[in-house]
Amino acid sequence: GIYEPAFRETYQWLTEQKAAEEREIGSAEIAGWLGFNSKEMWNTFLPELDQSYKEQASRMVGDLMVRQIRKHKAVWYPGAEEMLTALKNRGYHLVILSNCKASYREAHWKEFGMERWFDHFYDCESYGFRPKTEIVQEIIREYSGPYLVVGDRRQDLECARACKSPFIGCLYGYGEKGELNGAD
């Protein structure tokens, strides 16, 4: 993956700047932040970190991940493209709502030719890092239902509940046990 190396390089920089104390951070802890928006992630991981460092670290992680995407290091789960093609061929309108930054969205859109499947890719940065439960209300105004939400984190389940939609939970091996309890 591209997130962990980007995070580790950024964390090393924070320790070199004496903004954070050096400590061992396991892969499982790092993976646990996947699906969080950057503000939520840094406020969870290092709530005491000065805001200017949080912003710099967030930019650094994002920039490092975008570089890796452009070097073709990002990969999708096996079968994802085939499933998206099948859904599109059946006439479904597909949109993405991600807690990512705009630069990450743009890099993925271009790298994977996502316009083949998706009508729109919403990123939370473009909405001031508001919660998905708020952003989804804008999607509802733009696209008529019914809706089905597919996701891998608690934020996605909350989003589905906010728009009164069924939810399919995907277990990718990160997140907390029971986080997707209540998935349809």
Task: Please state what every model-predicted region is.
Residues 130-157:
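Conserved Lys-Pro-Asp/Glu-containing loop-to-beta segment of HAD-superfamily phosphomonoesterases
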Residues 1-78, 90:
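N-terminal helical cap/lid subdomain that shapes the substrate entry/recognition surface
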Residues 81-89, 140-141, 157-161:
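Surface-exposed amphipathic alpha-helices with a cationic face
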